[in-house]
UniProtKB/Swiss-Prot annotation:
One GO MF term: 4 iron, 4 sulfur cluster binding
Residue span(s) of domain MTTase N-terminal: 1-116
NCBIfam families xref list: 30S ribosomal protein S12 methylthiotransferase RimO (TIGR01125), MiaB/RimO family radical SAM methylthiotransferase (TIGR00089)
Name recorded for this polypeptide: Ribosomal protein uS12 methylthiotransferase RimO
Reported function: Catalyzes the methylthiolation of an aspartic acid residue of ribosomal protein uS12.
A matching Pfam family: TRAM_2
Family: Belongs to the methylthiotransferase family. RimO subfamily.
GO cellular component, as recorded: cytosol
Length: 438
């Protein structure tokens, strides 16, 4: 039977989708890209914030229409199901099977029952049985599940449960296997990568893990995402600064800078410590790229709080920045707080931060013009006039790309090249191959 997949939400969810694809493939199902050709459609949902929930519902309803054609079975899994399974079963009867995260241990049994199959296999989700969907060069490497931070706005601890690290041996085994498949870049992910190892080793071991990953011969780039400011150690900064394979890129979701807002969010850092860690990273690693995520319109955020945040962004000049309007989530402490901010105010504050960041980003990219960067080529434009790639400054699907004029007869796909930047536009860079001295 033909099976099609849709993965919604974050990269951590994508890894689960890749594991589910691996389950079907190892049981001899045919994986198809076009949903119109699929007899089974599997949707792995996100349920983190309101916009993600709405996207998931819309996608489910859209795919349900295909049951009038080839699609015989519609399966929905993931975070949205974990949060609202009973409600979804009542509201969308077109779905044949809802699988929550807590049911993943028996996922294949559930699917066998639905399809009336008996493979006789004890099949479970397995990091080592993933089918990669991220192309030939890059793979996400998930090092843990769940979260212990309990920020008051966030439903993830309720959805995913407590933080559980994988053993370093298991992670390295997967990483070596990915390298054998031709993967050149590993992106280390978890809800909080800086907490890695704390639960099984009694101490955080992200720096040691990164060093071990750098020893894998065919891996050329290692980067990590989702590091919390209070857990960034001198050792981590030192390891990043001293290892050529580790991209000088810190993704630090600070959420806010006002002490009063951070306290209501139950964040473990205050404004001063956030400022200090950013200054320290930039001092120790001069060419570092720092990305952050902010929330505006959190309950009780005053005009003074927002002004402090705006001025902080203006002064700090983050290289990359994402901002969300606060989303009131069921069964979270923040949803019960008084002084909920009006929707229009949240949107206004979001627009102001984004307008400021667009200006900062444009100025930052213009400073790159004339410089030469190592670029990983991943695709081409339709006409083939440009190669498209990324520098160490760019995370897939989060940041920009580099367009490189294709003026060579060589096939540069899936290779690293040197590129001289000629111009910047919006969030992207344009350049030419740099061969001087070669």
């Amino acid at each position: 039977m033909n099976v099609g997949f849709i993965s919604l939400g974050c990269s951590k969810n994508l890894v689960v989708t890749e594991e589910i694809i691996g389950l079907f493939k190892s049981n001899h199902f045919n994986i198809v890209n076009k949903k119109e050709d699929a007899e089974i459609i599997v949707i792995n949902t996100c349920g983190f914030i309101e916009s993600a929930k709405q996207e998931a519902i819309n996608t489910i309803l859209e795919m349900a229409k295909l049951k009038n054609n080839k699609c015989k079975y519609l399966i929905v899994a993931g975070c949205l199901v974990q949060r609202y399974k009973k409600e979804l079963e009542k509201a969308i009867p077109e779905v044949d099977l809802f699988i929550s995260i807590s049911e993943y241990k028996q996922i294949w049994k559930e699917i066998e029952n639905l399809l009336d199959l008996e493979t006789g296999k004890e099949s479970n989700l397995d990091y080592h049985n993933r089918v990669l969907t991220t192309g030939s060069n890059m793979a996400y490497l998930k090092i843990g599940e769940g979260c212990d931070n309990h920020c008051t706005y966030c439903a993830i601890p309720n959805i995913q449960g407590p933080y559980i690290s994988r053993t370093m041996e298991d992670i390295l085994k997967e990483a070596r296997n990915l390298a054998k498949q031709g993967i050149k870049e590993l992106i280390v992910i978890a809800q909080d990568t800086t907490k890695y190892g704390l639960d099984i080793y009694g101490e955080a071991r992200l720096p040691q893990l990164l060093e071990e990953l750098c020893k894998i011969e065919d891996i050329e780039w290692v980067r990590f995402l989702y590091v919390y400011p209070e857990s960034i150690t001198d050792e981590l900064i030192k390891v990043v600064g001293e290892n050529d394979k580790i991209c000088n890129y810190f993704d630090i979701p600070i959420q806010h800078i006002s002490d009063s807002v951070l306290k209501r969010m139950n964040r473990k850092s205050d404004g001063a410590s956030v400022r200090n860690i950013i200054e320290k990273i930039r001092r120790e690693i001069p060419d570092v790229i720092i990305r952050t995520t902010l929330i505006v319109g959190f309950p009780g955020e005053t005009e003074e709080d927002f002004k402090e945040l705006y001025e902080f962004v203006e002064e700090t000049k983050f290289d990359k920045l994402g901002v969300f309007a606060y989303s009131k989530e069921d069964n979270t402490p923040a949803a019960k707080l008084k002084e909920q901010i009006h929707h229009a105010t949240k949107k206004s504050r979001l627009r102001k931060i984004m307008a400021l960041q667009e200006k900062i980003s444009r100025e930052s990219l213009e400073q790159k013009v004339g410089n030469v960067y190592k670029v990983l080529i991943e695709s081409r434009t339709k006409g083939g006039n440009y190669y498209i790639g990324r520098t160490y400054m760019d995370v897939p699907d989060m940041d920009g790309v580099v367009y490189i004029v294709n003026n060579t007869k060589e096939n540069l796909m899936n290779t690293f090249v040197d590129c001289r930047i000629q111009r910047a536009k919006d969030y992207d860079l344009f350049g030419e191959l740099y061969t001087e001295g070669k």
